[in-house]
């Protein structure tokens, strides 16, 4: 079994940064590639112009700002990566990308930014573990 293609979902938490660092190290050994995924909330469609466009711009700006440290990490380590910013519930989007791209592994943090959900694992991580079409490596 060759592990070459990894998905790293991120949310700005320390846990997802640890997962990204681990994935970067792993790709050194496997000559692998990473798909970096960030999922944001749906655009507020009830807003009219110009408020709708302003909301889109703010969400896009926030998304780019959030994933910038991960971009810098992968560029600094010479890790081959692509990125996707998606408007969808994170567990569904993560599993769909993993399935569509035929990824070898999902590498994700054990918890997100909301530490109240879940006892041992974050709720997103729990759902991905149950729905994923490939192995999931959970990093603490």
Regions found by a protein language model. Name each.
Residues 67-71:
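A conserved short alpha-helical segment within the catalytic HATPase_c
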Residues 43-44, 91, 115:
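Generic structural signal for helix capping and beta-alpha/helix-loop junctions
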Residues 2-50, 73, 77:
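Small/aliphatic-rich secondary-structure junction motif
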Residues 35, 82, 137:
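Conserved beta-strand positions in the Rossmann-like core of class I SAM-dependent methyltransferases
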Residues 53-65:
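A short acidic, glycine-rich active-site loop
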